[in-house]
Amino acid sequence: MVRLFAPPCLRRVRTLEEEGYIQGYRGLLDPQRLGFEVTVFASVHLSSQADADLRAFEDFVRGEPLVRECWMLSGDVDFILKCVAPDMATFQEFVSHLTAAPHVRNVRTSLVLHNSKYAAAVPLELKVSD
């Protein structure tokens, strides 16, 4: 354990921010308490993997508030999206909008029944040795 007083600690934090180790600060909100009852993972297959088409899809997703995370994958699926919605009807409207997006060949969705683990941080204990 490192004991630092406020000024040295703040300098260390500022250095970590400047070097890009700390990317930002966020509050961890409970989606259900805020009325987002539905969490869904959507696997998206595109009709083209040309760079311009991949970027166009990413730009489309950035403008969609129900999409909380978007990951480009290797293998059978081009992208996986983590989405939240207040109800299934709202999510279904989004899926209709998503399937009509340029270059989207098909979308498969999986409704989350239960979250067994959520870890927002990286496992520093596996990398850091003091």
Describe the role of every protein-language-model region.
Residues M1-D130:
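A compositional/biophysical signature of low hydrophobicity enriched in polar/charged and small residues
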